[in-house]
């Protein structure tokens, strides 16, 4: 984007009617990137005008008319300017990429576009002029620019579109890239648990009364941990001399340290987990600056560290990457109440550092192929970041080996233009891309783009990065008509092939809708399981024909093939009286899938959707066995044990030899559930029993949790609060426990869970306004060393109002 203007006036005619008197001189001692700049200028001018300007390699300036590429020490690494020097055109820039970007920006000015790796637009011109009525010093809006889609990694595409990210295949010939080492989530690369934990558990998180490394973090107030982290970063600097930024960042889960020192620092920093983290990162950065003042230390403001600390400030050599992982992606952040909490954090971080980076999210990570209408948000929020002083953007999209994320090429190109110039007209850029790539089919494809975004503009149409959105009941038929029109308008097989690829998201959405499970009589399954499998195989063949290897983060197509093959229709066992109907699917983890309140005519359990990971084995009410409060549940194989009028018994064989039992019955207006964990083995096993349900909160914006604590304190508050994330969780124990009854009220629906205090050690509440609204209540037994023949028990009672 332009930075500085000084008046000049010159019109240089480089080519007229296919002829030119100009040659290109890359300078006396050009860098590899400046040699590439000369070659790219020569190639593209020839393609536009049929005039081939000679590239002259010379130690001193040749005679005659020249396009001179000049390295200027006084210009920044990516800054450049164009100017006239007599009859010469001078493209001057800093190193390593200034001159190269000066050439690409000039070609862009002449109408050259590099839309995708395969599609370039080169205008045909009989005359090529440069009108220099002013000298313009130019450079990018952000120092770090990375659209993180597989399609954006290509070296030529990335260089020509002036991005410089870590994952892009840029090398010395393109002026390199902004390289991290490692990229993120580096705590266990700094101090590998397999190396240190056995001898030094004090290096790792203190959680629930003991040191842990599984799904934990580092003890950030331990001075030896700081010393070892400094040594490791110095080793990285030696091993990766091309890297500029070194990541000292939390693991990708919770598990922060709860030791007295770390908690004391949290309290000093306003109760924020970011306090111990930033003090630790600053301590590492201070030592690194002494030996390597040109290197930067990076960390995250992410998840539990997203809120800024009260006192500590990032050092000048520290980059904070703020991650808006919980926001709505369909609306501009400044206009959406679901994103207000992030804007509060962004403003706060931007007040305490001028080195702020953003880790933005641009896809549905659970479903790379799902339509993801976020262009309104992008158009507003990339300029918004710039206004708030952000200096770098990582825009995380779909990144599997074979690419293929929804609108990946369009999104990458538009974002690259915004990252260079925040004043880019996104709407015009979308139209230009569609016309450039799809030609005569652009009009119906633009109509599809508008159809998709019209629904997203409605105030209640929130878009999240893991959930299945509501596209509206008529979206699929309208979309199919527009794609049919696009195919009819296409003039060649190559265009039709591109359109077919762009239609994959609509086909995938249809597949997910066909996967939806419902109760039909005494069965729980999709409407047509055989047809669903056939439809999946058809889509799978198309995906593979396009080289697409994955449609979910972390899972390949082989996983999906096994997943669809394993789908089944399940028997349903029901309990019913005048007040309630309870539907249970024993083979789905012994799960109660529906608790129907006949008076309210509502399911007291939350709705599930076919886009959820693990579907249909999700949601409902069930029981689990764990090693402790932090461990994941052990797998269990559930079966129906007994069903008779008014009572059902289920049994679950736990993978470690323990046994779960669930006894369900109706008593008036209550569902009574007794969950039992038994040890039939000959050895003691440390374990905890958990039981609970995913409840329907009604209107999530009105939903409240209400209970009286064991110490007598009354708790009654909304789940969704202004300037707070639209999701959350809380845990109570001791005198903070509910006194045997707690309730979720949500406008037209109310559900209570009753329990015995003598059986419960902890109670947990979690909630979300993302996707299918949910409020989950969980009860935990004490962690107990279960001897042979011993058991744990949790009894619950559920009722509506």
What role is predicted for each listed range?
Residues 281-307, 356-363, 393-398:
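Aromatic-lined carbohydrate-recognition surfaces of secreted/lumenal glycan-active proteins
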Residues 567-580, 587-589, 597-608, 647-655, ...:
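Beta-strand-rich recognition/accessory modules
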Residues 20, 32, 37-40, 44, ...:
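Feature activates predominantly on carbohydrate-active enzymes
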């Amino acid at each position: 984007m332009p930075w500085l203007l000084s008046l000049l006036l010159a019109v240089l005619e480089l080519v007229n009617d296919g002829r030119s008197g100009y040659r290109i001189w890359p300078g006396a001692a050009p860098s590899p990137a400046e040699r590439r700049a000369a070659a790219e200028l020569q190639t593209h001018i020839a393609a536009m005008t049929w005039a081939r300007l000679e590239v002259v390699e010379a130690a001193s300036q040749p005679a005659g008319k020249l396009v001179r590429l000049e390295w200027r020490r006084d210009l920044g690494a990516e800054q450049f300017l164009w100017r006239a020097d007599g009859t010469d055109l001078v493209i001057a820039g800093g190193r390593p990429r200034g001159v190269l970007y000066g050439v690409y920006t000039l070609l862009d000015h002449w109408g050259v576009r590099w839309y995708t790796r395969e599609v370039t637009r080169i205008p045909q011109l009989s005359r090529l002029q440069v009108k220099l009525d002013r000298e313009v010093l130019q450079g990018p809006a952000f120092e770090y620019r990375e659209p993180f889609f597989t399609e954006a990694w290509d070296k030529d595409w990335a260089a020509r579109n002036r991005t410089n990210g870590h994952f892009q295949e840029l090398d010395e010939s393109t002026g390199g890239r902004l390289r991290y080492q490692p990229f993120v989530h580096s705590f266990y690369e700094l101090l590998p648990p397999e190396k240190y934990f056995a001898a030094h558990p004090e290096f790792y998180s203190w959680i629930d009364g003991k040191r842990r490394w599984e799904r934990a973090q580092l003890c950030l107030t331990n001075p030896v941990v700081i010393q070892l982290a400094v040594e490791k970063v110095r080793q990285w600097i030696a091993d990766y001399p091309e890297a500029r930024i070194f990541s000292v960042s939390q693991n990708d889960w919770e598990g922060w340290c709860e030791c007295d020192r770390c908690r004391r620092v949290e309290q000093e920093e306003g109760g924020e987990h970011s306090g111990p983290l930033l003090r630790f990162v600053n301590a590492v950065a201070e030592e690194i600056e002494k030996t390597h003042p040109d290197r930067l230390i990076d960390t995250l403001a992410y998840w539990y560290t997203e809120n800024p600390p009260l006192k500590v400030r990032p050092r000048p050599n520290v980059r904070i990457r703020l991650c808006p992982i919980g926001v709505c992606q369909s609306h501009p952040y400044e206009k959406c109440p679901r994103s207000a909490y992030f804007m509060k954090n962004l403003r706060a971080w931007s007040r305490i550092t001028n080195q702020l980076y953003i880790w933005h999210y641009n896809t549905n990570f659970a479903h790379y192929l799902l339509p993801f209408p976020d262009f309104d948000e992008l158009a507003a929020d990339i300029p918004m970041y710039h206004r708030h002083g952000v200096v770098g953007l990582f825009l995380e999209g779909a990144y599997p080996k074979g690419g293929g994320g929804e609108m990946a090429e369009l999104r990458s190109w538009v974002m690259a233009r915004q990252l260079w110039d925040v004043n880019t007209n996104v709407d015009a850029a979308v139209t230009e891309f569609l016309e450039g790539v799809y030609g005569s089919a652009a009009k119906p494809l633009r109509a599809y783009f508008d159809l998709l975004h019209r629904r997203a503009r409605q105030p209640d149409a929130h878009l999240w990065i893991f959930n299945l959105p509501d596209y509206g009941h008529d979206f699929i038929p309208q979309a199919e008509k527009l794609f049919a029109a696009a195919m009819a308008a296409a003039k060649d097989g190559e265009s039709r092939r591109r359109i077919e690829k762009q239609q994959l998201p609509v086909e995938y959405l249809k597949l997910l809708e066909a996967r939806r499970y419902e109760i039909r009589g005494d069965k729980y399954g999709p409407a047509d399981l055989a047809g669903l499998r056939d439809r999946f195989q058809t889509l799978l063949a198309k995906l593979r024909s396009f080289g697409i290897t994955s449609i979910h983060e972390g899972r390949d197509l082989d996983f999906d093939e096994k997943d669809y093959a394993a789908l089944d229709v399940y028997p349903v066992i029901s309990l019913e009286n005048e007040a309630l109907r309870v539907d249970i699917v024993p083979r789905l983890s012994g799960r109660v899938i529906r608790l129907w309140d006949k008076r309210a005519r509502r399911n007291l359990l939350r709705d599930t959707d076919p886009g959820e990971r693990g579907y249909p084995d999700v949601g409902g009410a069930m029981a689990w066995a764990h090693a402790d409060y932090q461990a994941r549940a052990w797998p269990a194989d559930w079966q129906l044990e007994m069903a008779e009028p008014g009572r059902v018994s289920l049994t679950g064989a736990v993978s470690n030899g323990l046994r779960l039992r669930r006894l369900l019955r109706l008593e008036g207006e209550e569902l009574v559930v007794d969950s039992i964990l038994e040890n039939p083995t000959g050895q003691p096993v440390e374990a905890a029993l958990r039981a609970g349900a995913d409840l329907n909160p009604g209107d999530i914006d009105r939903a409240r949790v209400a209970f009286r604590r064991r110490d007598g304190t009354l708790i009654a508050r909304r789940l969704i609060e202004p300037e707070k994330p639209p999701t959350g969780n809380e845990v109570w124990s001791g005198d903070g426990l509910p006194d045997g009854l707690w309730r979720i009220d949500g406008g037209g629906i109310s559900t209570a869970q009753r329990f015995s205090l003598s059986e419960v050690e902890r109670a947990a509440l979690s909630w979300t306004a993302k996707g299918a609204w949910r409020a989950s209540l969980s009860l935990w037994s004490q962690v107990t060393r279960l001897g042979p023949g011993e058991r744990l028990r949790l009894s619950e009672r559920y009722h509506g109002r």
